[in-house]
């Protein structure tokens, strides 16, 4: 169960793709685009301190198994030994922005290792961002298993 939770936490790595040289969504406010890029790097590098800044204290993940995960569990999943994630492409992207908030999501096939064991899972997900006290943070993520293309 711990492995499954770690796998599903990886879904929030929305912008982790091969083509990182360009901004993922130039229509986003610069501060949000920067936070998204930092969040991406923090997940890929297992940077717990950065994740701690970029996840809201009241962050919640509803994973594809119907389990609920909080900020501490999410950070643990990304910083645990034997965890890695390969770059991936997001399909059917959803990008919505309004003053103080945003939804970023899509469908991705994720591959990597969790607790040293390989995994591959296809998920549809949504990350909810909020601007609080002048900084952008992820406040909520939902993940659902997606059918094969």
Residue ranges of model-derived segments:
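Cleavable N-terminal signal peptides
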Residues: 8-9, 19
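N-terminal signal peptide c-region/cleavage motif recognized by signal peptidases
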Residues: 13-16
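A beta-strand edge to alpha-helix "cap/lid" segment located at domain peripheries
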Residues: 22-55, 60-149
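Bacterial N-terminal signal peptides that target proteins for export
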Residues: 1-6
């Amino acid at each position: 169960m711990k492995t499954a939770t770690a796998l599903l936490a990886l879904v929030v790595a929305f912008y982790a793709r091969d083509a990182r040289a360009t901004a993922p969504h130039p229509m986003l406010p610069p501060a949000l685009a920067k936070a998204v890029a930092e969040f991406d790097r923090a997940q890929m590098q297992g940077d717990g301190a950065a994740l701690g800044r970029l996840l809201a204290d009241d962050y919640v993940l509803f994973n594809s198994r119907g389990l609920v995960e909080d900020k501490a569990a999410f950070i643990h999943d990304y910083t645990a030994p034997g965890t890695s994630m390969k770059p991936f492409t997001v399909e059917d992207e959803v990008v919505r922005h309004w003053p103080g908030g945003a939804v970023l999501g899509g469908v991705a096939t994720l591959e990597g290792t969790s607790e040293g064991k390989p995994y591959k899972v296809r998920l549809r997900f949504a990350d909810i961002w909020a601007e609080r006290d002048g900084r952008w943070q992820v406040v909520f993520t939902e993940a659902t298993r997606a059918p094969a293309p």
